[in-house]
Amino acid sequence: ELVVVFQQDLPGYLDGVKTAIEQNDNEGIARTAHILKGPLGTLGFFTAGALALDLEVMGRTNNIGEASTSFGTLSKELAKLEPLLIELSGDKSLATDAD
């Protein structure tokens, strides 16, 4: 069930981080990346979780110069995880667009 909820919420989290980056919103980057980091760790997606942590730290330290690049890396990592998420959820209709 956690996988299904995560898949449903993932596009919103990614949109939130992307929007915060576009608006140079340090707090928004940190907050949304922190929210995203939790389920990534719970599901065992440690590389993606570490990338979300990097974004969170960038936001908290007001050092978002590389946030766009880090977000791109996180998006690519999540795209690689999509087949596993679909397999774990058993529901192909929940495929996400991590771009």
Regions found by a protein language model. Name each.
Residues 1-35, 39-42, 46, 61, ...:
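Long, amphipathic alpha-helical coiled-coil segments characteristic
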Residues 51-60:
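Hydrophobic, amphipathic alpha-helical faces that serve as interaction scaffolds
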